[in-house]
């Protein structure tokens, strides 16, 4: 999720940048190769080569500014790739601590970062988290709401970065059976985990 220079700021979702460096050293030293979601979906690397036997995805959720200020320089140093799952409303609103579209564009130009959807605006609410149904919500209302949210996220990412969106990351790892047909229609790859 998030990165820091200050060990006192480490949480369940924030690691030190030196911790990321150790992780990247670990992967490199054991022969792992980072890939992007679109490469996973295609079953091959961009140059047409088959996926490496030790392919691995690095994923950073939410779109914190530290993905740009701290993680991107390390990705460049190691030649490592990562997927950054964006909550696009936070960027549109200029929420403090989150990426800006200018930063996203620079990350996209690096060729090392691919953006995934992490919803537009339905990340955490009182009656539902992520893409969960709201209490008493009909299936039709749910599908209309979630389709609009996900399509908005895809549109914002494509418009601002020029990247197609092939992946979705479930917020908080919360899945919803009603969402599956929509997700299958919109995305080639989905991720879950906390």
Predicted regions and their residues:
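Metal-dependent polysaccharide deacetylase catalytic core of the NodB/CE4 family, i.e.
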Residues: 1-7, 53-56, 65, 70, ...
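Conserved beta-strand termini and adjacent loop/short-helix elements that scaffold enzyme active sites
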Residues: 37-40, 85-87, 118, 193
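Short, acidic/glycine-rich phosphate-metal binding loop used to engage nucleotide
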Residues: 40, 61-63
């Amino acid at each position: 999720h998030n990165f820091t220079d200050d060990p006192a700021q480490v949480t369940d979702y924030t690691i030190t940048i030196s911790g990321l460096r150790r992780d990247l050293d670990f992967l490199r030293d054991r022969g792992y190769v980072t890939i992007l979601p679109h490469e996973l979906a295609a079953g091959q690397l961009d140059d047409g080569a088959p996926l490496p036997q030790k392919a691995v995805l690095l994923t950073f959720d939410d779109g914190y500014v530290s993905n740009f200020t701290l993680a991107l320089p390390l990705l460049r140093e190691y030649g490592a790739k990562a997927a950054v799952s964006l909550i696009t409303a936070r960027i549109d609103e200029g929420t403090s601590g989150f990426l800006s579209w200018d930063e996203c564009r620079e990350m996209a130009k690096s060729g090392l970062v691919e953006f995934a959807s992490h919803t537009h605006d339905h990340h955490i609410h009182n009656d539902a988290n992520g893409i969960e149904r709201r209490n008493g919500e009909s299936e039709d209302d749910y599908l209309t709401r979630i389709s609009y949210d996900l399509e908005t996220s895809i549109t914002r990412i494509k418009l601002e970065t020029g990247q197609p969106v092939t992946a979705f990351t479930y917020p908080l790892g919360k899945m919803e059976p009603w969402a599956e047909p929509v997700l299958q229609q919109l995305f080639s790859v989905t991720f879950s985990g906390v």
